[in-house]
């Protein structure tokens, strides 16, 4: 039996208030499949989707999903389903889902899939319980199929951060994992700032003493380097040679 979603009150955020800003260089670019006229536009849309979901500016080969890209390029699936497939991919699970707590997964999912931050701690708690009961796959389907996603992005637009005009972009303040996972990795990596690491390393070094072999100089044969014979060819040096003077 699925636990019903806990109720929470939305807070006032920029995307919930009508805005009349003049578009500028800070305005996010909207990548839509309806505006794609050639393959280069499709490639830019795919790159924007990877950047939005994985929050990485460089798309790694291990991150890419060729089958999803092929289906999107052939218009066999919508952008909504492409975003869904990226968020439910095994790569995303390994890099993001397995390295974060449920509370932070809620924050990451809302920012990358709905383009907004959590309203409050009550919303984080409510969705974290949903992840614990239904799993990550079902949680992604709930967000992507929600009315909020449909009203803001529809089927053919890549999600983006809605109405950002002051704060830094989400992809700059929401790294792949937080201090929770970083502290967990502290036990398995070298920490250069701890003096105890140097002491333990020094104690673990095994020094093999050098065995010096005594040598007697009584029987050392020194070769004779004195010249006993005169050269047969006389030296061709003329002491009366003169040199031009300026």
Swiss-Prot record:
It is found in: Cellular thylakoid membrane. InterPro entries: PBS_linker_dom (IPR001297), PBS_linker_sf (IPR038255). Its main location: membrane. It comes from the Bacteria. Keywords: Antenna complex, Membrane, Photosynthesis, Phycobilisome, Thylakoid. Residues 224-246 are annotated as: Disordered. Residues 11-189 form the PBS-linker domain. GO terms for biological process: photosynthesis. The keyword Membrane applies. It is a peripheral membrane protein. One of its GO terms (cellular component) is plasma membrane-derived thylakoid membrane. Residues 235-246 have a biased composition (Polar residues). The phycobilisome is a hemidiscoidal structure that is composed of two distinct substructures: a core complex and a number of rods radiating from the core. Belongs to the phycobilisome linker protein family. Rod-core linker protein required for attachment of phycocyanin to allophycocyanin in cores of phycobilisomes. Linker polypeptides determine the state of aggregation and the location of the disk-shaped phycobiliprotein units within the phycobilisome and modulate their spectroscopic properties in order to mediate a directed and optimal energy transfer. This is Phycobilisome rod-core linker polypeptide CpcG2. It comes from Thermosynechococcus vestitus (strain NIES-2133 / IAM M-273 / BP-1). The gene is cpcG2.
């Amino acid at each position: 039996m699925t636990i019903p979603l806990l109720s929470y009150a939305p807070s006032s955020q920029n995307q919930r208030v009508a805005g009349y800003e003049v578009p500028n260089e800070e305005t996010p670019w909207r990548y839509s499949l309806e505006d794609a006229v050639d393959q280069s536009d499709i490639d830019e849309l795919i790159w924007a989707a990877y950047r939005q979901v994985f929050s990485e500016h460089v798309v790694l080969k291990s991150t890419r999903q060729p089958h999803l890209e092929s289906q999107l390029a052939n218009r066999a699936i919508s952008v909504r389903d492409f975003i869904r497939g990226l968020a439910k991919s095994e790569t995303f699970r390994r890099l993001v889902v397995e390295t974060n707590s449920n509370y932070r997964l809620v924050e990451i999912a809302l920012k990358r899939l709905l383009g907004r931050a959590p309203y409050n701690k009550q919303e984080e708690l409510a969705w974290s319980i949903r992840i614990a009961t239904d799993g990550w796959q079902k949680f992604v389907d709930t967000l992507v199929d929600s009315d909020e996603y449909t009203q803001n992005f529809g089927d053919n637009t890549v999600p983006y951060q809605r109405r950002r005009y002051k704060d830094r972009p989400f992809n700059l303040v929401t790294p792949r994992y937080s201090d929770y996972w970083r502290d967990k990795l502290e036990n398995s990596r070298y920490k250069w700032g701890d003096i105890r690491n140097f002491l333990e390393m020094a104690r673990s070094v095994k020094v093999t003493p050098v065995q010096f072999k005594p040598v007697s100089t009584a029987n050392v044969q020194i070769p004779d380097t004195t010249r006993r014979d005169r050269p047969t060819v006389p030296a061709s040096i003329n002491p009366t040679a003169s040199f031009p003077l300026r």
